[in-house]
Swiss-Prot record:
Pfam family, one: RNA_pol_Rpb5_C
Functional note: DNA-dependent RNA polymerase catalyzes the transcription of DNA into RNA using the four ribonucleoside triphosphates as substrates. Common component of RNA polymerases I, II and III which synthesize ribosomal RNA precursors, mRNA precursors and many functional non-coding RNAs, and small RNAs, such as 5S rRNA and tRNAs, respectively. Pol II is the central component of the basal RNA polymerase II transcription machinery. Pols are composed of mobile elements that move relative to each other.
PANTHER family (UniProt xref): DNA-DIRECTED RNA POLYMERASES I, II, AND III SUBUNIT RPABC1
UniProt KW Nucleus keyword: yes
PROSITE patterns reported in the protein's UniProt record: RNA_POL_H_23KD
In-chain residues carrying the UniProt-annotated modification N-acetylmethionine: 1
One term of GO molecular function: DNA binding
Crosslink site: Glycyl lysine isopeptide (Lys-Gly) (interchain with G-Cter in SUMO2): 81
Name of the gene: POLR2E
Protein name: DNA-directed RNA polymerases I, II, and III subunit RPABC1
GO cellular component: cytosol; nucleoplasm; nucleus; RNA polymerase I complex; RNA polymerase II, core complex; RNA polymerase III complex; RPAP3/R2TP/prefoldin-like complex
Compartments it resides in: Nucleus; Nucleus, Nucleolus
Biological source species: Homo sapiens (Human)
Family: Belongs to the archaeal Rpo5/eukaryotic RPB5 RNA polymerase subunit family.
């Protein structure tokens, strides 16, 4: 792939990552959300084949709006298929900086042992992997994807009381659903899904993540 195409891809992926962090409630500046391709080139370079930028230069660390101690790394490994050695390096860095959550943007996937290590480290360390292909567009901006809002525990309690429901009576959404993964929604959480409706203005449904 030539430098121009690769630079464009890296810019698109980083832009989606910034939007994802923002949508999860992490502090991201408007400048980062609005960064143009030209600004990305000026900041990071436009010759990936010569290491400008290297993927590792794109590493992001964000802090949550509600709790600045709740921080999350976003790693961009160099190797196309990520192995256990890289995961150990990331984990070491997370331990040193006392950070328990990270996203890993991979080019082609992970080796079986690297995948297993993510499972073994949970729930102490939460590492989520995204294929870069998934991040070339922001799925939540697609016109067919309705608005998703993650509900707080208090909102769920109020919802169940209002409709005299038990949690297990709510319809389900899979934790592996692309939109659920985008928001980092965990099993047991409830999502409010808002769709436009010609008759009611908007139509709201609730889904329990399983």
């Amino acid at each position: 792939m030539d430098d121009e195409e690769e630079t464009y891809r890296l810019w698109k992926i980083r832009k989606t990552i910034m939007q994802l962090c923002h949508d999860r409630g992490y502090l991201v500046t408007q400048d980062e959300l609005d960064q143009t391709l030209e600004e990305f080139k000026a900041q990071s370079g436009d010759k990936p084949s010569e290491g400008r930028p290297r993927r590792t230069d794109l590493t992001v660390l964000v802090a949550h709006n509600d709790d600045p101690t709740d921080q999350m790394f976003v790693f961009f490994p160099e190797e196309p298929k990520v192995g256990i050695k890289t995961i150990k390096v990331y984990c070491q860095r997370m331990q040193e900086e006392n950070i328990t959550r990270a996203l890993i943007v991979v080019q082609q996937g992970m080796t079986p042992s690297a995948k297993q290590s993510l499972v073994d480290m949970a729930p102490k360390y939460i590492l989520e992997q995204f294929l870069q292909q998934e991040l070339l567009i922001n799925i939540t901006e697609h016109e067919l994807v309705p608005e998703h809002v993650v509900m707080t525990k208090e909102e769920v309690t109020e919802l169940l009381a209002r409709y005299k429901l038990r949690e297990n009576q709510l319809p389900r959404i899979q934790a592996g659903d692309p939109v659920a993964r985008y928001f980092g929604i965990k099993r047991g959480q409830v999502v409010k899904i808002i769709r436009p409706s010609e008759t009611a203005g908007r139509y709201i449904t609730y889904r329990l993540v399983q």
